[in-house]
Every structure is written in C-alpha cells, then in structure tokens.
C-alpha cells in the first residue's frame, strides 16, 4: 500500500510539472536578434595636440593601432613603427598610436611631454592620440571595440602589454591582433600590409 501511495504521488507530481512546462512558451518567431559587426569609423578621439581625429577619414586604408609607452623595454619599437609608416603611408596604410599608462606606469608624461619624447627620440610622424586607458573600468571606447568580440566581430582579447598591435582592414574591421613583443617589421605584419 505504501508503494502504491508513493507511485501515485510521483505520478501526480510528474503530470503537474508537465502541465506547467507546457504552459510556458517562449515565442521566438517574431524576435530577430541582429548583431552588426562594428568598425572603427564610428570613433572620434583627440590627438596629442587636442585636435579631433575622426577615424572615418581612414576609409579604404589599412590601419595599425598600437598602445605606446615612453619608459618601456619595448619603447624602441617606435623606430620600427616610424620606418614602416614612412615606407607604406603612400600605399593606404597608417599607424595610430595611443599612449597608455596601464602597464607599470611606463607612460607617466603629459600629452605635450609624450609628443616631445616621440619627436626628439624617434622622429615620429604617424598620428599620436591623447593618452588613454587600454584596460580596466576606465578603458576608452576604441579599446572596448578592439578587445570585445561582441563589438569587433573577430575575437575577445586583453591588451597584454605596451605595444600590442591591432590590424584593421580597409573596411574598418579588426582583422588581426599582434603580440607586444612581435616587431612591427615582422614578416607577418609586412605581408599583411602588402596584401
């Protein structure tokens, strides 16, 4: 008798749960989820001089975005960055530098000090933007785009250190992320520029 009562209770519970499950419906027929891949052309930032830089002016160009620092072991990459910029700038290629103080406080200077350092030590002529944050809660909008797959459509990434490179194709879309230690003159980078 005890087993029969237990069986009846189990059956009643099972059927009551089935009814509840059948009554819950999620209507997805009229819902369309659209994730549109963004591009860099939506961004406007300030350069080191305080002038507005509009990324939409770069349509049709390949772009390398790199976070920079003046007091880093990788700072000599400025020389290689400037070299490839000079060599390929007339072939629809541009480098955009974003000074950042996120790693070891290796970019403590003001915008004016950064501009002076870049010019005096490396003759930098490629566009340098206002100092920004490239990670954490105060990460700037363009780096949110670069590091979040939901925005760039390619991949999630963390900025590992100073001089991480983001390669943007002619349509303003993120195409590749290059590690900080990889030189700007690496064959994989040059091949991408020339392709």
Feature-to-residue mapping (PLM):
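Sec-dependent signal peptide recognition
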Residues: 2-8
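C-terminal motif of bacterial Sec signal peptides marking the signal peptidase cleavage site
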Residues: 15-16
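N-terminal "domain-start" segment that seeds a small globular fold
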Residues: 24-56, 76, 141
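Conserved helix-turn-beta segment immediately C-terminal to the redox Cys motif
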Residues: 61-62, 71, 75-99, 118-122
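Thiol-based oxidoreductase modules, predominantly thioredoxin-like and allied folds used
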Residues: 67, 92-109, 124-136
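Short, internal strand/loop/helix patches
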Residues: 112-161
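Thiol-/selenol-based redox modules, centered on thioredoxin-like
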Residues: 141-144, 148-195
